[in-house]
């Protein structure tokens, strides 16, 4: 079989990068596939910290599979086509390893799919290493651990599955790190946003969801102080409005998450703000509102928006 590109979603986070790099290695070792891990964007601050810590080179960034002369791909940490490579509909999806909802996904041929409602795609990839009797190199254990820490906010997010806890402990041992100490330093590295422009800030960790025919962009930034982000509200709103016009979003929802106190502020703009307010049972004042206890886009934001938009 010819080369297969393995990649996570656009605007890759630590789980997208870690799961794709590790799975590409596993696919070679376990099944003899000619795989290459690539990325659909440059690493964010948190992921750059992870790669540097474990001495792993960032995957090269690609925009099109066809431009690489590749006809076959494997997706990790996503399945929705609008979150994937630009020519996803023109290539063969060989397999998917994911922990999100399945939506806007269709293939012409059968494929391998591994979907589990766990805290991270990295958790699933680690299990697949064990199932296939493949040892996890120290640096890949570090990447997989980081993906799990990132997606579950160090196992504090409601997306954390009971099985994620022993996985985190095992990966920390394999990676040679203290779970709590490394996890906190890693998460803090991702909150250093002062050098980011407003346009960059709203695109660090952003995904587009098709909700009842509407293109809704849901972005998330982590911080240790929500007010640091809200102090830039004016320029952030300008960037959001530009993104709405340029990309054709109906609505843009920015989730500003306090990783210390496990709360979020929702900043939202667009044409369906009544639906956004109904989703969270709050009232937007000056385009934002507090959402107590919310840290997970996947579990505490997207399902609520989906229900509201479909009502």
UniProtKB/Swiss-Prot annotation:
Lineage: Bacteria, Bacillati, Bacillota, Bacilli, Lactobacillales
Name of protein: Probable manganese-dependent inorganic pyrophosphatase
Compartments, record wording: Cytoplasm
Matches recorded under SMART domains: DHHA2
Cofactor binding: number and manner: Binds 2 manganese ions per subunit.
Gene Ontology cellular component annotations, sorted alphabetically: cytoplasm
Family (UniProt): Belongs to the PPase class C family.
Record PTM text: Phosphorylated on serine residue(s) by stk1. Dephosphorylated by stp1.
Catalytic reaction(s) noted: diphosphate + H2O = 2 phosphate + H(+)
InterPro entries reported for this sequence: DDH_dom, DHH_sf, DHHA2, DHHA2_dom_sf, Mn-dep_inorganic_PyrPase, Oligoribo/pAp-PDE_c-di-AMP_PDE
Lineage top rank: taxon: Bacteria
Annotated PANTHER family: BIFUNCTIONAL OLIGORIBONUCLEASE AND PAP PHOSPHATASE NRNA
Cofactor(s) of this protein: Mn(2+)
Residues binding Mn(2+) 1: 9, 13, 77
GO molecular function, one term: inorganic diphosphate phosphatase activity
Keywords carried by this UniProt record: Cytoplasm, Hydrolase, Manganese, Metal-binding, Phosphoprotein
Enzyme Commission number(s): 3.6.1.1
Residues involved in Mn(2+) 2 binding: 15, 77, 99, 151
Pfam families assigned to the protein according to its UniProt record, in alphabetical order: DHH (PF01368), DHHA2 (PF02833)
